[in-house]
Regions:
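Hydrophobic/aromatic-enriched cytosolic interaction surfaces used to assemble or bind macromolecules
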Residues: 1-293
């Protein structure tokens, strides 16, 4: 189960969410998805498919429900979007630029979730200063590893209050790199069977380097490219590969934001689609149909 600070997240196995659904719901025991979704719909009156937003350092990309082929529209920020879309529901994804993770997972002690979060928070404070004391945390675990992800740069409580003032309900908040990672696994079935592999999710200069062991996520590291270019990404991949992988370990790259990302023939990775463009490629568009889970 994933947990946010001291409250269990209402999410299915495999999700990584900084969830901000109604506070009293966070105290309930997790139920099977269909029953829980039905109860939520009846009790809270969900208002249909949610809008999807991706928040990055320059604003937000917004996808409206209904037209699956429409490109995302740019807005100055989440609050601006909320004021223009009163009375709606939204699922929010956040750029790797807004997430932090524990670099050395081996340093995490074998404690319970509360102890793990406490240890991780202190590690974030030691590295990033007192501001990290209030960052929302989400823990994840699977058969081979566990980890902690922090949300930095977005005040979720303030955002939720602003949404309430405009009748906007935030259904979920999660890292964009995790959404892209799941799409990479869907597109490259070999990732699920490789003993070791890597997925690099690119968002301009921000990138997430995800390590897999036995087909599941074992480590996440946030990277900052020297510049938003293929050559800079190649240097980062070579450095990460030298640190954590051999030449025979598969590497998959996907994303957007590289100025010359239309030509990736020089990249030492299997590239899904193109890596240029200001916004995520259409095939990576997040679903606006799924309910919070």
């Amino acid at each position: 189960m994933l947990l946010l600070n001291d409250a269990p997240l209402l999410s299915m196995a495999g999700d990584i969410r900084f969830d901000v659904v109604v506070a009293d719901a966070l105290k309930r025991r997790v139920k099977p998805f269909r029953g829980w979704s039905r109860e939520l719909s009846q009790g809270l009156g969900l208002r249909g498919p949610a809008h999807a937003l991706l928040a990055d350092a320059h604003g937000v990309w917004a996808w409206a429900p209904g037209d699956r082929y429409a490109a995302a529209k740019r807005h100055g920020g989440v609050r601006e979007w909320m004021r223009a879309h009163a009375g709606t529901d939204v699922r929010l994804w956040v750029s790797a630029a807004f997430t932090q993770s524990i670099e050395d997972l081996a340093s995490l002690p074998p404690r319970d979730d509360a102890g793990l979060r406490s240890h991780a928070r202190q590690a974030f404070v030691d590295r990033h200063g007192d501001e990290a004391a209030t960052w929302p945390l989400a823990t994840w675990q699977n058969d081979v590893a566990r980890g902690v992800v922090a949300l930095a740069g977005i005040d979720l409580d303030a955002l939720r209050r602003h949404g309430a003032q405009n009748g906007v309900r935030i259904r979920s908040v999660e890292p964009w790199w995790h959404h892209a990672f799941l799409e990479a696994k869907r597109c490259v079935p070999a990732l699920a069977h490789a003993a070791n592999a890597h997925v690099c999710v690119v968002e301009g200069r921000a990138a997430a380097w995800i390590t897999l062991a036995g087909g599941v996520m074992s480590h996440v590291r946030r990277c900052v490219l020297e510049e938003a270019s293929v050559s800079s990404l190649n240097e980062t991949i070579e450095r990460m590969r030298a640190d954590r992988a051999g030449d025979d370990v598969p590497i998959v790259a996907l994303g957007h934001g590289l100025g010359d990302g239309g030509d990736t023939t020089r990249l030492c990775a299997h590239v899904l689609g193109r890596l240029d463009g200001d916004q995520p490629p259409q095939w990576l568009r997040p679903s606006t149909q799924n309910e919070v889970h």
